[in-house]
């Protein structure tokens, strides 16, 4: 088994993670699979061999029934589950969302799935359950009453929070993952600020259980600065999880290897995480491209990990006093040049 990747001087939990969906069969909206699908539990040893200490999964990938076997296998591999997440986007029943659907029967099913996922999260030993906003949104104006949709989100997350608090105390926390669009034209919980406001509207007892799982590509699709998104989460004490990848412009969600498209901003991100003493696991949400052969399917993960380690060690060497000096002197162009030297220099 490969030696797990670690980050030098990382505070708290060390080791990297990736999702079982990261090494899928290569299907996209314009074409079917280019590789044979790999059984989900067979993907855990592959992630371990790629140097991952943590795995992540949706409830349609590792089901509640599979969870005990997955937990046992993970222990054997020396892995842990970093996060578990219910899929509110794949099944046809959730074509117009789960919590925000106009159909009360669909909302009821979504809540049942969410509560079941809380139980499975505990079985897998994960500390975090993620809610991605997937199909919670609209394609046509006035298709939903936006104020009602917001109230349904508050009501839904309150139910989940109270259920978890009653049954598991603070054993499980919840990280909402914002995205502005895709698969919907417009999505609720589109950005970090929107999610922070949503959390502020939850019942006081459950607010401490809710935070965020920001993803690089999701911020960049919206034309936002991912570093600032992370800083905002940190300032609010709500950075519960993180997904790293790369995004080449404001296009479809590409899930490219971390460090590929904007390495200088990625360097700055790691400076921020180091200075904040971020103690959680660092995980990737990347996707093996259609063109990769089955034997190379984990390249997307190992390339991301090596880029992260290289940038992390560069970030450790960034002189924070120099940054402060550039700020005091208002030499911000010079600051950008210094960061470039830190990135590209010896």
PLM regions and their residue ranges:
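Active-site acidic/histidine proton-transfer and metal-coordination neighborhood
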Residues: 3-8, 76, 80-81, 93-211, ...
């Amino acid at each position: 088994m490969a030696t797990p990747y670690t980050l030098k001087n990382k505070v708290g939990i060390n080791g990297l993670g990736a999702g079982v969906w990261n090494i899928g069969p290569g299907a996209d909206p314009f074409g079917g699979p280019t590789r044979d699908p790999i059984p989900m539990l067979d993907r855990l040893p592959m992630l371990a061999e790629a140097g991952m200490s943590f795995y992540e999964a949706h409830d349609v990938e590792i089901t509640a029934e599979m969870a005990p076997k997955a937990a046992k296998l993970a222990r054997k591999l020396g892995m842990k589950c970093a996060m578990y997440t219910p899929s509110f986007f794949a099944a046809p029943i959730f074509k117009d969302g789960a919590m925000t659907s106009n159909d009360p029967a669909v909302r009821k099913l979504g809540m049942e799935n969410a509560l079941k996922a809380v139980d499975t999260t505990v079985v897998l030993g994960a500390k975090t359950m993620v809610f991605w906003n997937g199909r919670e949104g609209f394609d046509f104006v006035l298709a939903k009453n936006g104020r009602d949709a917001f109230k349904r989100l508050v009501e839904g997350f309150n139910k989940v929070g109270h259920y978890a608090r009653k049954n598991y105390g603070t054993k499980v926390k919840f990280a909402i993952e914002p995205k502005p669009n895709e698969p919907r034209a417009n999505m609720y919980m589109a950005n970090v600020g929107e999610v922070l406001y949503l959390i502020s509207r939850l019942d006081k007892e459950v607010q401490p259980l809710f935070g965020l799982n920001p993803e690089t590509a999701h911020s960049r699709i919206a034309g936002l600065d991912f570093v600032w998104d992370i800083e905002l989460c940190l300032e609010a004490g709500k950075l519960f999880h993180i997904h790293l990848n790369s995004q080449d412009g404001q296009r479809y969600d590409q899930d490219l290897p971390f460090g590929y498209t904007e390495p200088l901003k990625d360097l700055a991100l790691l400076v921020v995480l180091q200075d904040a003493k971020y103690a959680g696991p660092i995980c990737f949400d990347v996707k093996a491209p259609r063109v990769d052969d089955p034997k190379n399917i984990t390249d997307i993960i190992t390339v991301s990990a090596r880029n992260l380690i290289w940038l992390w060690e560069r970030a450790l060497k960034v002189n924070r006093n120099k940054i402060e000096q550039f700020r005091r002197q208002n030499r911000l162009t010079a600051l950008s040049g210094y960061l470039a030297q830190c990135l590209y220099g010896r």
